């Protein structure tokens, strides 16, 4: 079946030729940076309704980190529209990092709707290089649907470990590759070159759980979840936490 992948990729390319030409000419990225926040606002609102109970379960563990100050320093990496804010407990001091500056107005709206949080700042940066943040400055890093689209998951996870305090937690929720040998994986491979343009660099076939397990955290807890939308080529999800 592998021999079919290049042929089917070519067919998809021909069907979406205008998009690929815009990308080749350097015109697509500015368009994508503008429309992508609106797309994410729509999709996250729908998907979070399906995942709400699991999200609340995952992020409820943050309150256990509160010390005598009753505060938690929290970095949301690839913050997007701020859709996770509703799940964070009171007392979180939230710093947001995203390479797309067009998300900031969505973040402002989300913060206005979540007064139980303290909004520190929004940093325009890539996860591979968060030099604006000091070493061991965060109790928690949250990373949801981000490692699929970064240039180097390994470097991002190194930066996460750098900014986390000793014993700090990484909470993650990521979509990953379909099982090896499955027909679903074949279609992910076919669609991925085009999907990366549509999804602002999103990869469909990453085995992100391997990156997390190799990142030298002292402990990793991980569980699998089915994809929220059957009509999208996005595969199963992994959720969990890792301890520095």
Swiss-Prot record:
Its EC number is 2.1.1.9. GO terms for biological process: methylation. Residues 1-23 form the signal peptide. Its main location: endoplasmic reticulum. One of its GO terms (cellular component) is endoplasmic reticulum membrane. It is a peripheral membrane protein. The keyword Lyase does not apply. It catalyses: a thiol + S-adenosyl-L-methionine = a methyl thioether + S-adenosyl-L-homocysteine + H(+). Thiol S-methyltransferase that catalyzes the transfer of a methyl group from S-adenosyl-L-methionine to alkyl and phenolic thiol-containing acceptor substrates. Together with TMT1B accounts for most of S-thiol methylation activity in the endoplasmic reticulum of hepatocytes. Selectively methylates S-centered nucleophiles from metabolites such as hydrogen sulfide and dithiothreitol. Belongs to the methyltransferase superfamily. This is Thiol S-methyltransferase TMT1B. The gene is Tmt1b.
